[in-house]
Amino acid sequence: MLSAATNRLTLVEPRPVDPNASTMFEHLEYLKYRHPRTFALLDKSVISAIDAITERANRLKEIRGHGDFDEDERGAAYRGRQLAVPRAREYGDLRIFTELAKRLGGFSFKQVGLDIIGGNGTTARNASNLLPLESAPYIIAGDPCLDMVDDALARHLPAVWQCAQETLFADESLDFVVGSRGFHHVSAGARPAVFTEAWRILKRRGVVLVVDFEEGSPTANWYSEGLDRYTNAGHRFPHFQRAEFLNFLTAAGFKDIDVFELYDPFRFWADTAEGARNSLLEHLVGMFGLVKLQRESGETERDYWGRIDRIFTPWCTFAADEVAFDPEALRRLSVFQEADQRWRAEFPRVALCAIGIK
């Protein structure tokens, strides 16, 4: 994928010999050739110097906490499921865009945003699916997992190999920064630096929005208990308290700060109640790589999905006061028939949304 760009473009001479730096060098050359709008926003003092490229690339390779998205872990399954069922988290996606647009005074195709835990371009795809073409902003994915970045680039989406706490973007180059759902993968010690970095790269009146899950909540426990127990890679990452988000935003210099709950369910539709529920459960098992939840010998399909339903129940069951903030929020995994006679299965989740303005 990178060979064409490498043959045509030169950033620095001589080319780096460090293997990590060489990978970064080829990545940057590819961006310059195939994604010039993204490349133009990068910090030229970094990307034009071999020493700087080498230092950044080596620090990036040392980052831990994102390896479970590599090709040989659950990365391929995660990407595949997201692409196959783009509407599964549509309700939460729309809420995120609504809150962001409210602070920006609306969206424009001239705006440029960065998803700092962007994976393979999920936020950019969601924007193209959910926002009007004439106003959808240009959204770049940044991620420390090179497999994720390469997958985004292969799908013609702008993506940069970098970490959230040390991006490659120039000062005051972006209109908004988003950290959507995967922020807990950033190590606890690096989290304050992410907000400081967001402040640096945002334009005046730019907006930062981070979505993750409150420590101890059923949704956070889905990751720290469910994924940790039933995936090969485990999932031991601390989530957040409301006060932490407030402190991070305040210390970085943001104003008009708000931290609030956001309903972020998985939803699936089918022609039958059983089909909707089973499709939802199958999606969750596959997307999150729950390979230790296999169907047992002699277990019928009905019994298998019933067992999975019971295992998942603690991680999608809420008290009434925990979901009172949204009239559409459900308290437990539910299946019901809608007006068009189709059945909808819903796996409730509650996230924390933290927003600040520069």
Where are each of the predicted segments found?
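Conserved class I S-adenosyl-L-methionine
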Residues: 7-109, 122-126, 148, 209-233
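Conserved Class I S-adenosyl-L-methionine
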Residues: 16, 34-39, 258-357
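Class I SAM-dependent methyltransferase SAM/SAH-binding core
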Residues: 114-166
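A conserved beta-strand element that flanks and buttresses the S-adenosyl-L-methionine
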Residues: 178
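Short catalytic micro-motifs in class I SAM-dependent methyltransferases
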Residues: 181-182
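A short glycine-rich, Lys/Arg-flanked "PGG" loop and its adjoining helix->strand segment in the class I
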Residues: 192-204
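Short alpha-helix
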Residues: 237-253
